[in-house]
Amino acid sequence: MVNGEEYVETPNLIHDEETRKDVKFNLGIELLAGTLAGVSSCILFYPLECVEAKLQVQSSSTAVAATMLGLKKNGGSGSGSSSSSSISHQTPNGPIAMAKSILRNEGFKGFYQGVSPTILGNAVNWGVYFSIYRATNHWWNSTDINGNQYQGPAWVGHSVSAITAGVITTAIVNPFWVLKIRLATSKKYSGMKHAFQSILRSEGVGGFWKGVGVSFIGVSEGLFQFVSYEYILNQMKESNLKMNGGELSVGNYLFAGGTARLIAGVLTYPYLLIRSSLQSETCPYKSMSEAVKGIYKTNGIKGFYKGIGPNLARSIPPAAFMLYIVEFFRDTLTNFSQ
């Protein structure tokens, strides 16, 4: 106790498992800091996210078209080859071609198609995620099941916190991602309100939770990312011991954050593609297993990684800076509240 305030030793988001600092936990500040960080990141990097979403949905749509043409060809139409060729010419192949297509057909504003639900989704996503993550970390490192302060490796608490935050956040935020995918890939909606009403009318409340099952698999993304991040930081700290006593530079943190995101992105990207496909209005698949079979049958293993380039280009920079953005807002809000 210090002046009536309770302080506990809690691992900082960017500290290795050996390092702890005294932190006064404030759920409101954590929620607001995560919200502001999510909005800032979304505004800066949404164009790449839009390109990525269009490529992911295009992958499943192309797979369906190819399957239907194959059926027609087997039925004796004889036009399968030429039609298949026309499909490949009509659809942009790759992130650069997709970006050019968006700019040519929709102008610069096309890169921000569907941005409204994404801003709201990011605000809720990171606000909820970081507040739950920090709250779980606070609880985990305050006591164990016997009421004693936890003294084990910090990565265990990080893992439990990441899984807990990921599951709860996914369940809450999924409707925003459904709206984002619909607005980013379809021109039939005049805005977020129209899309919301249309989905509710034609698909019911359940339509907003399309793809939520596969989204839960994505909880592993945060787990892979954070464990990798902690490990890389620890290795760099050990290598810096002889030079500067183990102090880590800003570059060290950015490298660790970017590399950890790269590892997590490569391992979990297929689920992102399947989730986007299931949430798309034109998706012909009724389940995750059906989507996996359809994509694999048409494009093989590489089909599960279509669009991974813009995904990594979009996600690595904000991942490398996100923790610092959160720390900045957290420190600013803490100082302002005192």
Curated annotation (Swiss-Prot):
The keyword Repeat is annotated on this UniProt entry: yes
A GO molecular-function annotation: folic acid transmembrane transporter activity
Induction: Regulated by the MADS-box transcription factor srfA during development.
Chief site of localization: mitochondrion
Keywords: Membrane, Mitochondrion, Mitochondrion inner membrane, Repeat, Transmembrane, Transmembrane helix, Transport
Listed PANTHER family: MITOCHONDRIAL NICOTINAMIDE ADENINE DINUCLEOTIDE TRANSPORTER 1-RELATED-RELATED
Identification of the protein by name: Mitochondrial substrate carrier family protein I
Upper taxonomic lineage: Eukaryota, Amoebozoa, Evosea, Eumycetozoa, Dictyostelia
Encoding gene (name): mcfI
